[in-house]
């Protein structure tokens, strides 16, 4: 399995003070995962901590090959915090 970042995943990096390593850590070791649809490739919503302990929300494409592509990453919004309870 290989995980990579699409440029769209970097959209909020400056605003949220996150970098590629933060995104990859949160995507690789998520606390919470849910499928968003049954399309191919499948989209997953993931919540995970970055290297500084901040909770990130991510959307990851899962390909048949097992490779993954992060297409969205940002500081988790309040609406997602309840998912961890």
Region locations from a protein language model:
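Ribonuclease/tRNase effector modules and their secretory precursors
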Residues: 1-85
